[in-house]
Amino acid sequence: MRVAIFSSKNYDHHSIEKENEHYGHDLVFLNERLTKETAEKAKDAEAVCIFVNDEANAEVLEILAGLGIKLVALRCAGYNNVDLDAAKKLNIKVVRVPAYSPYSVAEYAVGMLLTLNRQISRGLKRVRENNFSLEGLIGLDVHDKTVGIIGVGHIGSVFAHIMTHGFGANVIAYKPHPDPELAKKVGFRFTSLDEVIETSDIISLHCPLTPENHHMINEETLARAKKGFYLVNTSRGGLVDTKAVIKSLKAKHLGGYAADVYEEEGPLFFENHADDIIEDDILERLIAFPNVVFTGHQAFLTKEALSNIAHSILQDISDAEAGKEMPDALV
């Protein structure tokens, strides 16, 4: 099958082409994001493969359907950028990679928490300037702290295991449909969203973005949280109202923010803007805080995850071509 792969980078080329040796699909790698302006680049393809910041809204899907596209394969777990209702009406199948490597993101979230809490980035910067002073670098033990997790799927459960068994933290968690057996196995406690917000020393987000939880971390929830708490977001930028985070940081209520995602990351992330003037004043203000650790959506980026993603999407494409059932299908 001929597949147009949007938002592709060198690491995508390597992992997907290597895995494709076992499948033999005709792959067309495109650097551009999928938008209504670039959708025509999928001409002559039968499927498109997209990533987190590609746009697959109704307008784009109509263009793709007109080109004869029958399959949209997401090389990620989240699918908030795809209009599933429109895809269904247009008879376009949509598949995702639900569990490519929960360890990659969970381990990265731990790394971000430690970098924020122990001020590792500031320490590294100091010693490179021959400054070995420790003033202002005091952190906290994660051990025995209350760690609240919002969203306990594959990634959230791995993060909970690390916090519980690796750090000896008191882990509480919220998800709409709790799994008591999982909580017992890992060693944490399910509770209400209110308790997670109000009693946690550290809150880590591990849930998909939906219309219902957009800006679930906002001015009101931040005000209810413990003074000095840390917030970690490796899920989706839209879960957090960035303006509210900035306000809470300025008021010294939020102790620190570690994020690998940003609500308006689409036109910025995965590209080199070193010589550009960034016009997003909210982002520029956010990353200026000394108690903010911010990276460009790299939590997924491990060799194992890339290999698993490549295998999953190519297998789904092969199954679609053969008319087989696809376990990871959304539509």
From Swiss-Prot:
<feature type="binding site">
    <location>
        <position position="260"/>
    </location>
    <ligand>
        <name>NAD(+)</name>
    </ligand>
</feature>
<feature type="binding site">
    <location>
        <begin position="154"/>
        <end position="155"/>
    </location>
    <ligand>
        <name>NAD(+)</name>
    </ligand>
</feature>
<dbReference type="InterPro" id="IPR006140">
    <property type="entry name" value="D-isomer_DH_NAD-bd"/>
</dbReference>
<dbReference type="InterPro" id="IPR006139">
    <property type="entry name" value="D-isomer_2_OHA_DH_cat_dom"/>
</dbReference>
<dbReference type="InterPro" id="IPR029753">
    <property type="entry name" value="D-isomer_DH_CS"/>
</dbReference>
<feature type="active site" description="Proton donor">
    <location>
        <position position="297"/>
    </location>
</feature>
<keyword id="KW-0520">NAD</keyword>
<feature type="binding site">
    <location>
        <begin position="297"/>
        <end position="300"/>
    </location>
    <ligand>
        <name>NAD(+)</name>
    </ligand>
</feature>
<feature type="binding site">
    <location>
        <begin position="234"/>
        <end position="236"/>
    </location>
    <ligand>
        <name>NAD(+)</name>
    </ligand>
</feature>
<dbReference type="Pfam" id="PF02826">
    <property type="entry name" value="2-Hacid_dh_C"/>
</dbReference>
<dbReference type="GO" id="GO:0051287">
    <property type="term" value="F:NAD binding"/>
</dbReference>
<dbReference type="InterPro" id="IPR029752">
    <property type="entry name" value="D-isomer_DH_CS1"/>
</dbReference>
<dbReference type="Pfam" id="PF00389">
    <property type="entry name" value="2-Hacid_dh"/>
</dbReference>
<comment type="similarity">
    <text>Belongs to the D-isomer specific 2-hydroxyacid dehydrogenase family.</text>
</comment>
<dbReference type="InterPro" id="IPR036291">
    <property type="entry name" value="NAD(P)-bd_dom_sf"/>
</dbReference>
<protein>
    <recommendedName>
        <fullName>2-hydroxyacid dehydrogenase homolog</fullName>
        <ecNumber>1.1.1.-</ecNumber>
    </recommendedName>
</protein>
<feature type="active site">
    <location>
        <position position="236"/>
    </location>
</feature>
<dbReference type="GO" id="GO:0008720">
    <property type="term" value="F:D-lactate dehydrogenase activity"/>
</dbReference>
<feature type="active site">
    <location>
        <position position="265"/>
    </location>
</feature>
<keyword id="KW-0560">Oxidoreductase</keyword>
